[in-house]
């Protein structure tokens, strides 16, 4: 006999999707036929068969057919119909469950809620913990509980809980002390020990989540010397020069001086446009090759293509590292800023990766006393760090901040990856749009490899955030867009799925994310966000075509990447972009206007090089916080290219600034 349980929390909340997991857990344990007290029911028929039998059956067997129908509907991707059947099932009290059933129930509830972090999912893990006997399963439960907690949206973590939920209160207090102290490892270590004393009955007090165990084992390390590995000749030279100048300016404290001057001038009500300029190249010594430190400054129309040079980034569109107890140059939000407050005496040497093989340069850097490597820049050189045995041997135990990210990442305990990639920006956009409550995004992308990469990155991040299908539409050249305008065809707000989303496994059954292959339009209430990857010229053609398709009362929100940002655009362009949100690095969105004025003049308005200069500034900050980025989960640096944090594999993520065009002005997006 098949059993059905629709369980109710004592707070009265229903979890109908949980029942689906219970159904699957029950049904997958059945043989080819499910034996009831009346007749054998085939367990692998289609949903329509079960629904028909359900209508013709008595109450004793009707529920069995209904359970199997729901299971079949889910397998067939007919989720709305499955949800209707779930809602029709009878509720019973969870107190009637025995221990094995409670374990199956809690696991089902976890499986059903994994795609969207919530307090109810945390409660499910808490309910499961005392039912587990295997030590490895207990540790996994603790780690998953913590992972869910740190992923909770702020409104969820601030909800009022029941007075008798002592274990949940302990977990929330652990989350709070982590968030309050994660920027200072020593304070965090002490706070965790105090928490363990105050909550001795909490499962995590006995066995910490793995990330917090790493915090307890944290050890800081000073930077004895830095080797900057960049291509100083060839097409990528201009990019290297921009990065090197930003790195040197941060090392010498020049960016902090600019910030101080801005604050003083702001307090006095004065402009900072007249701040003296400095090329920021002092303090680095070329080694292993010649270096043109000032470098040629090219106009936007003459510099080489970064992609052709192997540079993957947005260019295409304190004497020691701080100790655990002090973080120099902290921002107002408690995060270390992108530059220490004074010039550093750490020796820095620059090595030319275009003149010598990488193993020779790494060996030379070690002989020269370097303990930290910044670079290499080109993607093929970065891939050598783990693909080439000679390079890997030469790297030894050196800490390495690679200035690019390979296509197929192979994590290494001594390597972090920092890139200004369009994929990174797409992931940030997916999270930003999802946090604004949008449900169905449409990507407007250029045809070709760039569009493919952005589509995959956005879609992956969207699914990870709990979103469903992402739609895409491709466009061609500006000439093709103009032809669409002239012909009256414009842009149709329809799309096809980027790809099948990650399948969800519930109680041993893998359920594909349902896809809608039909045309979807905002009039049908489906598409409520459009993310556009386009140049300023292309965007000036696309935006009016979209405006013609939707009414002024439409909830359709428009977003664009930094590829579309035109800093020197006139008032007409700003008015044309009304309502559009776009992302870019903090330096280009008003974080330090005087510094931006200096750098943009230095690079003759080439904002792609300004972004690489900002990357150099942040590379210096990351070098000074390398231990924290590698060992402290959630550690952040307020950088010029974004708020910087690291994944478990030490890929540096950037949370960007978002602005919005409103009445001809740019304001911070909400």
Curated annotation (Swiss-Prot):
Disordered, as annotated region: 258-343
Low complexity bias (residue ranges): 328-343
Compositional bias annotation for Polar residues: 268-281, 290-301
A biological process from GO: regulation of cell shape
Membrane topology: Lipid-anchor
Keyword annotations: Cell outer membrane, Cell shape, Lipoprotein, Membrane, Palmitate, Peptidoglycan synthesis, Signal
Subunit structure: Interacts with PBP1a.
Role according to the record: Regulator of peptidoglycan synthesis that is essential for the function of penicillin-binding protein 1A (PBP1a).
Protein name in UniProt: Penicillin-binding protein activator LpoA
């Amino acid at each position: 006999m098949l059993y059905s349980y629709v369980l109710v929390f004592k707070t009265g909340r229903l979890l109908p999707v949980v029942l689906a997991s219970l159904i699957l857990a029950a049904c997958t344990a059945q043989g080819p036929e499910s034996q009831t007290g009346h007749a054998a029911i085939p367990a692998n028929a289609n949903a329509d068969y079960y629904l028909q039998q359900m209508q013709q059956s008595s109450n004793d067997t009707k529920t069995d057919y209904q359970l199997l129908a729901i299971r079949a509907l889910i397998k067939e991707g007919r989720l709305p119909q499955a949800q209707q059947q779930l809602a029709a099932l009878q509720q019973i009290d969870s107190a009637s469950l025995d221990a094995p059933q409670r374990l199956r129930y809690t696991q089902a509830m976890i499986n059903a809620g994994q795609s969207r972090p919530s307090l109810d999912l945390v409660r499910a893990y808490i309910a499961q913990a005392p039912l587990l006997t295997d030590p490895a399963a207990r540790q996994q439960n603790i780690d998953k509980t913590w992972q869910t907690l740190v992923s909770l949206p702020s409104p969820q973590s601030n909800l009022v809980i029941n007075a008798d939920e002592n274990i949940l209160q302990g977990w929330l207090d652990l989350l709070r002390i982590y968030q309050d102290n994660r920027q200072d490892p020593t304070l965090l270590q002490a706070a965790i020990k105090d928490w363990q004393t105050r909550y001795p009955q909490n499962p995590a007090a006995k066995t910490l989540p793995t990330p917090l165990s790493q915090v307890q084992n944290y050890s800081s390390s000073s930077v004895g010397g830095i080797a900057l590995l960049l291509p100083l000749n060839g097409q990528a030279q201009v990019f290297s020069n921009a990065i090197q100048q930003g790195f040197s300016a941060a090392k010498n404290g020049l960016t902090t001086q600019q910030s101080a001057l801005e604050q003083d001038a702001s307090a006095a009500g004065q402009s900072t446009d007249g701040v003296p300029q400095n090329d920021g190249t002092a303090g680095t010594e070329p080694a292993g090759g010649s270096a043109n430190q000032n470098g040629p400054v090219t106009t936007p129309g003459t510099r080489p293509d970064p992609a052709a040079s192997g540079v993957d980034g947005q260019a295409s569109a304190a004497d020691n590292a701080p100790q655990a107890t002090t973080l120099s140059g902290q921002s107002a939000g408690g995060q270390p800023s992108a530059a220490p407050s004074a010039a550093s005496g750490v020796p820095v040497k620059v090595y030319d990766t275009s003149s010598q093989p990488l193993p020779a340069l790494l060996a030379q850097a070690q002989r020269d006393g370097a303990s930290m490597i910044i670079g290499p820049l080109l993607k093929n050189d970065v891939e050598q760090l783990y693909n080439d045995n000679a390079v890997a041997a030469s790297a030894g135990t050196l800490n390495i901040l690679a200035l690019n990210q390979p296509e197929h990442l192979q994590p290494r305990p001594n390597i972090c990856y920092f890139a200004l990639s369009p994929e990174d920006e797409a992931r940030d956009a997916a999270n930003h749009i999802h946090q604004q409550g949008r449900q169905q995004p449409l990507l407007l992308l250029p045809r070709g490899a760039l569009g493919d990469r952005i589509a995959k990155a956005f879609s992956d991040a969207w699914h990870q955030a709990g979103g469903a299908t992402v739609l895409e539409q491709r466009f061609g050249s500006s000439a093709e867009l103009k032809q669409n305008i002239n012909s009256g065809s414009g842009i149709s707000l329809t799309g096809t799925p980027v790809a099948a989303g990650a399948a969800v496994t519930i109680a041993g059954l893998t359920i594909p994310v349902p896809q809608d292959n039909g045309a979807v339009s905002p009039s049908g209430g489906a598409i409520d966000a459009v993310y556009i990857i386009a140049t300023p010229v292309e965007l000036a053609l696309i935006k009016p075509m979209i405006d013609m398709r939707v009414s002024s009362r439409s909830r359709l929100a428009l977003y664009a990447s930094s590829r579309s940002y035109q800093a020197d655009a006139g008032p007409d362009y700003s008015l044309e972009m009304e309502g559009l949100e776009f992302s870019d690095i903090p330096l280009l969105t008003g974080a330090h206007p005087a510094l931006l004025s200096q750098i943009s003049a230095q690079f003759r308005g080439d904002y792609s090089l300004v972004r690489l200069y900002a990357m150099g500034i942040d590379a210096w900050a990351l070098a000074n916080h390398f231990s924290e980025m590698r060992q402290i989960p959630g550690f952040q640096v307020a950088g010029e290219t974004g708020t910087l944090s690291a994944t478990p594999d030490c890929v540096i993520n950037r949370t960007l600034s978002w602005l919005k065009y409103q009445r001809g002005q740019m304001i911070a997006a909400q």
